[in-house]
Amino acid sequence: MAFELPPLPYAHDALQPHISKETLEFHHDKHHNTYVVNLNNLVPGTEFEGKTLEEIVKTSSGGIFNNAAQVWNHTFYWNCLAPNAGGQPTGALADAINAAFGSFDKFKEEFTKTSVGTFGSGWGWLVKKADGSLALASTIGAGCPLTSGDTPLLTCDVWEHAYYIDYRNLRPKYVEAFWNLVNWAFVAEQFEGKTFKA
């Protein structure tokens, strides 16, 4: 069965003024879609035919991994964002962030540094480790925490195509704007153990 491009969970213009309609049209409809098309061209006739996207990400390498992980990462990223979102988490997630980082402001500062400091194209992540603790991670290219057994909670796409139309080379300005869109309800669901299937 062929993989399909999941629709955005909101309208293309819903994240303005922080992320423009034009960026989402290119980022989702073209870049994300290209990874889906590539994956559908690469998988037939391989051991990965008939596997779920998550299974492919965890067990593949090379071109199949790169495209599968980028499909998964992008679908996860879209869900990490929402219109009229941002602010701070509450409840158990907020408690865990405070325990791991000292305060929400310290977490925000460290996550921002991790994302802005990712070398080249990649992703900044908040993950839950197997022991339940929270940690930050930076992955290069198509890197995905699923391959290390971590549970992704939040990601910021720092490939240039995520922000270049709106912010040109100013990655820090994009990451600053990202905080206005974080969908803490979704992040909390991941923290509480809801399994995300892209």
From Swiss-Prot:
Gene Ontology terms, MF aspect: metal ion binding; superoxide dismutase activity
- Cofactor(s) it depends on: Fe(3+)
> Gene3D superfamilies attached here?
Fe,Mn superoxide dismutase (SOD) domain, Iron/manganese superoxide dismutase, C-terminal domain
User: Could you say which EC number(s) this protein's record lists?
Assistant: 1.15.1.1
Matching entries from InterPro entries are given as:
Mn/Fe_SOD, Mn/Fe_SOD_BS, Mn/Fe_SOD_C, Mn/Fe_SOD_N, Mn/Fe_SOD_N_sf, SOD_C_sf
Q: Which reaction does it catalyse?
A: 2 superoxide + 2 H(+) = H2O2 + O2
Q: Where does the source fall among the domains of life?
A: Bacteria
The first-level EC class reads oxidoreductase
The cofactor note reads: Binds 1 Fe (3+) cation per subunit.
Tell me which UniProt keywords the record has, alphabetically: Iron, Metal-binding, Oxidoreductase
Q: Where does Fe(3+) bind?
A: 27, 74, 157, 161
Q: Which PROSITE patterns does the protein's record reference?
A: SOD_MN (PS00088)
* Homology family: Belongs to the iron/manganese superoxide dismutase family.
Q: How does it assemble?
A: Homodimer.
Q: What does this protein do?
A: Destroys superoxide anion radicals which are normally produced within the cells and which are toxic to biological systems.
- Official protein name in the record: Superoxide dismutase [Fe]
Organism source for this protein?
Pseudomonas putida (Arthrobacter siderocapsulatus)
- Gene (UniProt): sodB
